[in-house]
Amino acid sequence: MLAADGGKGTPRQIGIADADPGSISAAVWSPDSRQMAVLATSNHGTPALFDVSATGANVRRVALIPGAVHGPKFSPDGSRIALLYSSPSEESNGPTQATPRDTGAMDTHIDRQHLAIVDVAHGQMKVISKPDLYVYEFDWSPSGREFVVSSANGSGNNNWWVARLEAIDASRGAVREIAKPAMQIAQPLWSPDGREIAFIGGLMSDQGSTGGDLYTVPATGGAVHDVTPNIKVSLTTFRWRNAGSVLATMLSHGASEIGTVDAHTGALQPLWSVDESILSGRTRGIPEISATTDGSAVALVRESLATAPEVWAGPPGRLTQLTHANTGARPSWGKAVNVQWHNDQFNVQGFLIYPMNFDATKHYPMIVLIHGGPSAASGSSFIAENSEQAELSRDGYFVFMPNPRGSYGQGEAFTRANVKDFGHGDLRDIMAGVDAVIARYPVDGKRLGVTGWSYGGFMTMWTVTQTNRFRAAVAGAGISNWLSYTGENGISEWMVPFFGATAYEDPAVYAKSAPINYISHAHTPTLIIVGERDAECPAPQSFEFWRGLQHEGVTTELVVYPDEGHHFANPEHQRDVLRRDLAWFDKYLK
C-alpha cells in the first residue's frame, strides 16, 4: 500500500506485517484523516480489519472476521467502522462466478449480506441489520445514529434490481422505509445537514456498473425527486460537497467528466473532461474518483487506449501525476479513435482500434466487438496485452466497439431506449456505425466479423439471425431463447425493468427479441463459447442456439468450459478462448 501527501510528495510504502502478502482489498480514511481502516486477510486467508495511522507508523489488527467483508466506512466520530458482512455459511458466489451445481432441494440456501459495526478500540463486531435483509450499500447519517441502506429481502444475487432505500438504527437495528424507487438504485449518501438522501437512479443491468440520474429523497421518507432529468450524460459516482451541491463523475460520449451538480435545481457545472478512463477502484470503465470532503481536490487513476494507468491528484483540471509505475508501458495494439455517427434520432458513439503495424495502402478486415450489460459502455482504457482487442489488432484486424442505444454516456433516455426493444434499435445503431466506419476508414466491408459476451453474446446470436453481412461470428455466454432462459438463470429479476413484465406475463415482448425464433435466417459460421456453470447466461442457452444452427446446416462449433461461470477464472481457459477466437476469424476472414 502506498500513500502520498496531497499530490506533493513521493509516494511512500506502508507495510502491514500481520496481513497476508498482496491481500489488501480496501482502505478508507477516518473523518480526521489521521488513520485508515484497511481490509486484508491474515492467518492465511481469514478476513481482517486493521487500524493504520496516516504515516504508517502504527498498525493494529482490530479484528479477525471469518466470512466475507466489504466496504468499510468510519462513523462520523471515528470510533466505529461499519462494513458489509456475510458469515461463512451465508457466503455465496457472485452471479458472475461459477455457480454450485443444482442438485438436491432448490432454494434451500439463501445468500445474505449484513450491515455490521466494529468498535475500533475493542474490536467487537455487532451485526445490526435484520437476518432476512440483504444489504447492498450503506452510508452513515451525519449524527452517527442511523444508516441509509439499499436492501432487499431474499437472496442478494437476484434481488438487487428491486432493492429499496431504508434507514437502520445504529444501536437497535430498527428499520424504517425511506423510499421504494421504480428504478435501480446505487450509492445512497446522506446529505451533510442530515435532511436528504441522494442516490444515482436509472436502468442498470448489473450491480457495480452504475449510470443514471441524480435523485434525492427526504431522509424522513417521501417522494423521490429526479434532480437531473434531462442531462445528456450518465452520472456514475458522486459525493456531497455541501448541503446543496455534489461533486460527480460522468460518462459523456466516451469521455470521462467531473463536475458539480446543484442538488436542488440540477444545474450542472463541468469542471474537467478527458478522453480517457478515470477510476479509483470500483468498476473499470465506469468513471470514479476519490475526493476531499469539500470536493476541492480529487485523486484518481487515469488511463486510455494510448496511455497506461497512473495515479493523479489535485483540483479537477489541475491534476499532478503522483506515480510513474508504468512509464515504460506502451500499447501492444494499434492506435484508437473515438468514432461518432447518426442513426434514427441518436448521435451514437464508439471506439475503433487500428490494426497493429497499419499500412495505409491496404484494406483490413474488421471485428465488431459488442460490450456486455447492456447498461455499460466500451471506453478508452489501457487494455490487457492478452485481451481480445489487443490480440485481434496484432492479428491484423480493425476492432470496432460501438456504444448503441441502451449504453451509458448520453443520458437516461438513451440508456432506456432499448426497453422492450432488445436487438432492434441497438442493432440498427451498430450497423449504421459499421457503415460509417467503412466509409471513413480502410475497412474491407466484405470481411466483417462480430463477437461479444453476455449481452454482447446475445447480440451476436441475434445479429447472425438478422443480417448476412458478417462472414464469421463468435458468441460468448449468449442468450438465445428468453422463455427458457427465464427458467434457467439465477438472476431473473433483471429482466422485468428491460422488458416491462416477466416472460410468463408477456411472452410476446420476449419472443420478438429471441434469436432462436429467427434461426432459419442464419447463415454465418458461428463459434459458441460458454462456461459450464454460468448462472447469468446458462449453458443450455448456447446449446439451443448451437442445435438450431446445426438444424439449419450452418457451420457451427460449441465449446463448454468445465467449472467456469459467467466470467472465466482459469487462465488456461482464458487463453484457449482467445486461441479459438482468433483461429475462427482467421479461417473465415483471411
PLM regions and their residue ranges:
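A flexible loop/linker signature enriched in serine peptidases of the S9 family
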Residues: M1, A17-I24, A37-F50, L64-H70, ...
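N-terminal, post-signal-peptide region of Sec/Tat-exported proteins
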Residues: M1-Q13
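Beta-propeller fold detector
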Residues: T10-G15, R60-A63, K126-S129, R176-A179, ...
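Residue-level detector of Asp-centered blade-edge/turn motifs that repeat once per structural unit
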Residues: P31-D32, P76-D77, P142-S143, P192-D193, ...
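Hydrophobic beta-strand positions that form the internal "hydrophobic ladder"
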Residues: S33-A37, G78-A82, F147-V148, G194-A198, ...
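Serine-hydrolase catalytic core recognition
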Residues: G285-K590
